């Protein structure tokens, strides 16, 4: 007997079930047809029909002849939802696989750099500009990866996420009268059209008596910051530091809160000083935002006694050199230097 074996090299193709086919499966099951017969009628493999039934079947409690019973029911919509969910789950890994090792290494190094220059958002934007042909995930996608534990970087490695804050308009009355109210501030300061208008604040470490403090000044238009370590949180040290800064930087006005350490600022000649309303830190939002960034390096409750001015300036420099989304991903330092020389 001449026996021969034929091996087919034809590529077999597989096509997912359509919504119409799933509806037909549900209808055929409702009239009692078996999977094999359904497969024959649809021109599908029996295993395909069986898998679809198993994936989309649910058990419902129904009354049959007045008695409760458990009936298996196929919901074609349920099958579709399952397929979509599996596809979405797989897409995370497909996206991650398309990202180069060079990007992931650079991202990990940037997030762990001390002092850190980039946020997740600014790193993504900068890397995309420098590597135009590379596959670069979006900021949102990277945050999703981090929260799902897919990356080496963890949530704890990110001290601050980008937040969108609601702007407040309520202005409570000022109880202290240390000088001119913020309500008297000219529009050119309010709309940031003029260069040289600053916001000022104090950053504390420990809460012990005699603990040093940090004076922070931020230029409103460019968000460029200057910091000074003070021996103590007192008006005399604040005024001394401000006078030193006025010799180095263009300071036309300062907006402060009602803290006692700022009570003598109005005595400085050639300087317009405005005071925000009590309990209204949002009126000095630029300075508050910088203080939050500085807390990455100097956590609350950490004593400032061992902190020296050089290290403080390194921290400030790192923040000033970060690309900022509000500046079209230019740094505050670059804008400050360009505006100062204009």
Swiss-Prot record:
Task: List each copy of the Integrase catalytic domain by range.
Answer: 182-342
Q: Does the keyword DNA-binding apply?
A: yes
Pfam families xref list: HTH_38
Per its UniProt record, what InterPro entries does this chain match?
Answer: Integrase_cat-core, IS30-like_HTH, RNaseH-like_sf, RNaseH_sf, Transposase-Integrase, Transposase_IS30-like, Transposase_IS30_CS
Query: Keywords for this entry?
Result: DNA recombination, DNA-binding, Transposable element, Transposition
Could you state one GO biological process linked to this protein? DNA integration
Q: Which organism is it from?
A: Streptococcus salivarius
Under the heading PANTHER family, the entry gives: TRANSPOSASE, TRANSPOSASE INSI FOR INSERTION SEQUENCE ELEMENT IS30A-RELATED
Give the function comment from the record. Required for the transposition of the insertion element.
The protein's name is Probable transposase for insertion-like sequence element IS1161
One GO CC term, this protein? cytosol
One GO molecular function term?
A: transposase activity
Family under the similarity heading: Belongs to the transposase IS30 family.
């Amino acid at each position: 007997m001449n026996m021969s074996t034929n091996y087919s090299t034809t590529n077999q193709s597989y096509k997912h079930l359509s919504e119409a086919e799933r509806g037909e499966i549900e209808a055929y099951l409702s009239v009692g047809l078996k999977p094999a017969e359904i497969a024959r009628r649809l021109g599908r493999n029996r295993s395909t029909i069986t898998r679809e039934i198993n994936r989309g079947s649910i058990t419902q409690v129904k009354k049959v002849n007045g008695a409760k019973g458990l009936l298996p029911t196929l919901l074609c919509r349920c099958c579709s939802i399952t397929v979509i969910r599996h596809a979405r789950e797989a897409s995370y890994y497909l996206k991650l696989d398309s990202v180069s090792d060079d990007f992931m290494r650079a991202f990990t190094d940037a997030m762990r750099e001390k002092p850190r220059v980039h946020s997740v958002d600014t790193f993504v934007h900068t890397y995309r500009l420098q590597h135009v042909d590379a596959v670069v995930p979006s900021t949102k996608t990277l945050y999703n990866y981090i929260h799902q534990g897919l990356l080496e970087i963890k949530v704890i490695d990110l001290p601050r996420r980008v937040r969108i804050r609601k702007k407040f308009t309520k202005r409570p009355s000022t109880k202290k009268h240390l000088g001119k109210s913020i309500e008297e501030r000219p529009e050119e300061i309010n709309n940031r059209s003029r260069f040289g208008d600053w916001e000022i604040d104090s950053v504390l470490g420990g809460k012990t008596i005699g603990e040093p403090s940090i004076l922070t000044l931020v230029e409103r238009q460019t968000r460029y910051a200057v910091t000074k370590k003070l021996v103590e949180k007192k008006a005399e040290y604040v005024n001394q530091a401000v006078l030193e800064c006025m010799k180095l930087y263009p300071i036309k006005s300062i907006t402060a809160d009602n803290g006692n350490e700022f009570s003598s600022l109005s005595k400085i000649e050639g300087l317009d000083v405005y005071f925000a309303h009590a309990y209204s830190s949002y009126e000095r939002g630029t300075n508050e935002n910088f203080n939050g960034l500085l807390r990455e390096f100097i956590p609350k409750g950490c004593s400032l006694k061992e902190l020296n001015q050089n290290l403080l300036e390194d921290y400030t420099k790192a923040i000033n050199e970060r690309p900022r989304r509000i500046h079209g991903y230019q740094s505050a330092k670059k804008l400050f230097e360009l505006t100062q020389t204009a």
